[in-house]
Amino acid sequence: MNRTALYAGSFDPVTNGHVDVIRQACRLVPRLVIAIGVHPGKTPLFGAEERAELLREICAPLAAAEGAALDVVTFDDLAVSAARRVGASLFIRGLRDGTDLDYEMQLAGMNGAMAPEVQTVFLPASTGVRPITATLVRQIAAMGGDVRPFVPDLVAERLRARFAKP
């Protein structure tokens, strides 16, 4: 039985919430593929390659500690297409609250209609990371706030450098 899981997102930036979901997923599957969505209409704070580099550096040790293989890829089409390309049989989705659940249930239904062979697995966020969103992290960083409680140290350094006043 194939137990490769795909965790798709923008990861702009990588947050402690993302890392929490990745850690949980690595405990469940022997192989996790983190898929960074690239959308031509959006201008991300960090480019896709930089986000991939950050994810590899931050998450490879976590995956290794759990005995899971970790790959990081980019995609610019449907997540179901990315899942098929990497041979995933599971979608991993993190849930912070009921609002996330409502949205994620719709997404799971649509993905299930397009790719019934790929099952969605919801992982509840750990209590300490539930309020974290990448959008809020970007806003705090842009206004000179301290994002260290919300992101890995490497990401905090990159955000500080990105928003440094000349």
Curated annotation (Swiss-Prot):
EC top class, as a word: transferase
SUPFAM superfamilies listed in its UniProt record: Nucleotidylyl transferase
Keywords linked to the UniProt accession: ATP-binding, Coenzyme A biosynthesis, Cytoplasm, Magnesium, Nucleotide-binding, Nucleotidyltransferase, Transferase
Localisation: Cytoplasm
Cofactor(s) demanded: Mg(2+)
Signal recorded as keyword: no
Binding site for ATP: 10-11, 18, 94-96, 104, 129-135
Pfam families attached to this UniProt entry: CTP_transf_like (PF01467)
Functional pathway: Cofactor biosynthesis; coenzyme A biosynthesis; CoA from (R)-pantothenate: step 4/5
Principal cellular location given in the protein's record: cytoplasm
Residue sites binding substrate per the record: 10, 42, 79, 93
CDD domains with a match to the protein in the record: PPAT
EC number: 2.7.7.3
Reaction catalyzed: (R)-4'-phosphopantetheine + ATP + H(+) = 3'-dephospho-CoA + diphosphate
Chain positions of site Transition state stabilizer: 18
Family: Belongs to the bacterial CoaD family.
Subunit (UniProt): Homohexamer.
Protein name, UniProt field: Phosphopantetheine adenylyltransferase
Native source species: Methylobacterium sp. (strain 4-46)
